[in-house]
Design a protein with these regions (language model features):
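Helix-to-loop junction immediately C-terminal to a conserved catalytic motif
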Residues: 79
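Conserved ABC ATPase "signature" region
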Residues: 128, 143-161, 186
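Conserved structural motif at the start of ABC-family nucleotide-binding domains
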Residues: 33-35, 48
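Catalytic Walker B motif of ABC-type/P-loop ATPase nucleotide-binding domains
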Residues: 190-194
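Conserved ABC ATPase signature
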Residues: 165-169, 173
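The feature captures the beta-strand-to-loop junction immediately N-terminal to the Walker
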Residues: 64-66
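Conserved ABC transporter NBD signature motif
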Residues: 87-95, 104
Length: 284
């Protein structure tokens, strides 16, 4: 009798596993994120005018364009900080408006352009806040929480600073802490708003190389907003160029970044050349 019950339990477990696998397969071919006919206005000022785009899973996609093009508003909508007037945003086929903030934070991590923390908080304690979406109120750290904290500190090269106050770090180091906190969420998608702002060139490159590492070694889908065209070309698999609330160009940097597209996006004349096989944009 026990053997029969055991077999029934096994069959039930196998059926449940099969259902979960089938459900996962349903979304397997969906883009990491998709925007469909997105509109948004501030009062009578139309900022986004029917934006549609797809974010390829496992790639680095950069959104760029001149000030006022709508990229910051698009970022806010993609991170659930604003709600669209019309249109939808899908995360692996699921409308993000149907996800509460905690559910969304288990799937998407965000690094804002401006961040602040109390002066006395340590690196490790700030990074640990990334586990909040996975916890109940007043719940202590689980073994998985501790593992993720250690991993996030390790991958961002912050182990030696773990007990130091964040306020005592350089700008580049602080940015790594915020990225580590986002990584601690354990998501497959990371969205960054101008992650190199206010950093000198050394730390800009350091942060972008870290972003590239996260993508190449851990398969994290990266979506970021950048101003520097050459950095976007160097570190992106895909570029989305916006102007006046619409997408003008979308695709491989090698194909979409041209003198003509730069003129359309920014209203300036820049030359496009190659050095050692790599494309660069130069003033003319």
């Amino acid at each position: 009798m026990r053997s029969k019950e055991k077999n029934m339990d096994l069959t039930s477990t196998e059926n449940e596993a099969a259902k979960k696998a089938k459900k996962a397969d349903k979304w397997a071919d969906k883009p990491a994120m998709e925007v469909r006919d997105l509109h948004f206005s501030y009062g009578k000022n139309k900022v986004l005018k029917g934006v549609s785009l797809k974010i390829e899973e496992g790639k680095i996609t950069t959104i760029m364009g001149a000030n006022g093009c709508g990229k910051s508003t698009l970022f806010s909508l993609m991170t659930k900080n604003l709600y669209p007037g019309k249109g939808n945003i899908f995360l692996k086929g699921k409308n993000i408006q149907n996800l509460n903030l905690k559910e969304f934070a288990r799937k998407v991590a965000i690094v804002q352009q401006y961040n602040s923390a109390s002066d006395d908080i340590t690196v490790e304690n700030l990074v640990a806040f990334g586990r909040t979406p996975h916890k109940k109120m007043m719940q202590g750290d689980s073994a998985e929480d501790e593992r993720m904290i250690e991993w996030a500190l390790e991958v961002t090269n912050l182990m030696e600073y773990r007990d130091r106050e964040v306020s005592r770090l350089s700008g580049g180091q602080r940015q790594r802490v915020w990225i580590a906190m986002a990584l601690c969420q354990g998501t497959k998608t990371l969205i960054l708003d101008e992650p190199t702002t206010y950093l000198d060139i050394r730390y800009q490159i350091e942060i972008l190389q870290l972003v590239k590492k996260l993508n190449q070694e851990f398969g994290i889908t990266i979506i970021m907003v950048l101003h520097d065209i050459n950095q976007a070309i160097t570190y992106s698999d895909n570029i989305i160029g916006m102007k006046d609330g619409v997408v003008l160009v979308e695709g491989d940097p090698e194909e979409v970044i041209t003198e003509e597209s730069i003129r359309e996006l920014y209203g300036i004349e820049l030359g496009v050349t190659r050095v050692d096989g790599r494309k660069f944009v130069l003033a003319v």
